[in-house]
Amino acid sequence: MKKIYTVLILFFVFFQAHASYLLVPMDETQKDHLKAYGLTYWVIAQGAKADWMLNYRGGSFCFPYQQAFENECLIRGISYEVIPDAQYNKIVADIANPEVNMDVMKLETPPKVAVYSPKSKQPWDDAVTLVLTYAEIPYTVIYDEDVMNGDLPKYDWLHLHHEDFTGQYGKFYSAYRNQAWYQEQVSENEEIAAKFGFTKVSQLKLAVTLKIKEFVAGGGYLFAMCSATDSYDIALAAEGIDICESMYDGDAADPQAQQKLDFSKTFAFENFNISRNPLEYSLSTIDVSHSRNVPKDLDFFTLFEFSAKWDPVPTMLTQDHEQTIPGFFGQTTGYKKELIKSGVLIMGENKPANEARYIHGEFGYGTWTFYGGHDPADYKHYVGDPPTELELHPNSAGYRLILNNVLFPAAKKKKQKT
């Protein structure tokens, strides 16, 4: 019996000595896809390097074996496999085959993450803040004062909260102007505007918008969701033009505002019309929320498949265990495809409805990604609804797209071939 135990112990020691890699599968076998991103972030933060195996088992992660890494998998409830050198080398060789649409990206440096969000309490959650917290990825909350004080270069990746960069407070005036949270939001923004010498909040928001544009031009990574996406581009197009009515800035909007818009300044959209009705819960014709006629049981969008070896950036941003993602509403739900600039890459769309849901582009040395909708795990998230409990959605395919964007800046850059 002692000999048997000795053999088993020696086998275990031998196996561990040759079990040199820890593979985190990201296909349907994974118990918690979202926490797997946080684990990978933590691993590279410890100074190790990680492989992002694009299109291999749902976009799996792999790194040299350490007992501490395995312990973290166990603590966080993440599925993993301990594999020997030979198996790892075979996987890498299979991925390198030019006949298969796979590639390996090296993740080296954890990005410094900033979330743009007001200090005043808002009656809605923010999907990115929720998933960063759940995945245990560290982030810093910043707002207009930090941006105006020049803090953006401290960060690699910036998320824009559910924000209205036009200075119209999300056009919530009609329904919520008597609510304490709305009044607090107005007061906070007016106070910051005055602090930096602006007479209108719209002027402050434009200055912030331009600072963010500089951040992207200098090599920053911008990610925005919901109303932060189209309102950002509207603010760029309306630079120097008054598009706010008196309840928002104390005087009337420029009657020629539409004709004066400059679409050459925007990231993603062109030829849109701004909403001139100050009481309408809509900013422009970019968003499909009020024009779409898609029943819930048919509300999905499909991710495009890109060449992993030739187009690694969009391939990273679309890694998922599902290619068809359940749709979800937001103040901005999706984008009319005919209003998207020709150079913008559409990564996810509802083709029958002619709407894009997930788009990407480059500006200067940086990149931006816009993702329509408010909460991937809540089909319609209303003002005042409780936050989503991601413990109930650990395998959300829609939330994975957010985390792809967080890890994307950690990748060692390869020269894009197309």
Language-model segments: residues:
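Hydrophobic targeting/anchoring helices
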Residues: 19-126, 135, 373
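Catalytic beta-strand/loop cores that center a nucleophilic Ser/Cys/Thr
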Residues: 126, 133, 230, 260-383
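Extracellular/periplasmic catalytic domains that process cell-envelope and extracellular macromolecules
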Residues: 106-109, 150-153, 215, 339, ...
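Helical hinge/lid and interdomain linker segments adjacent to catalytic or ligand-binding clefts
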Residues: 21-22, 27-31, 62, 66-71, ...
